Amino acid sequence: MDVESRKSLDRRLARVEGQVRGLRRMIEQGEYCCDILTQLSATRSALDQVGAELATSHVRTCIVGHGGETEHDKAKPMSGDELIEELRVTLSRLVR
């Protein structure tokens, strides 16, 4: 993963962290449950976006970039079938 991708993920996670703190504060202050659920939904969506960005980076650097210039330095040698299986596993982890 390149430096810009790491920075982008870190920024997104910092936002999620702030949203979680906001959720805790809302619960502590006894806010209206529907408002808390709305914030919870937004937090979950933000975390899903982190997962999508990370999966995209993995596909770009470890699957599509396998054996090329963009390959991640920790990518394992894989055959064509293993690359397809890696993509299947990546997608299944994202949609769980």
Task: List each language-model region with its residue ranges.
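Solvent-exposed interaction patches of small proteins and small membrane subunits
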Residues: 1-96
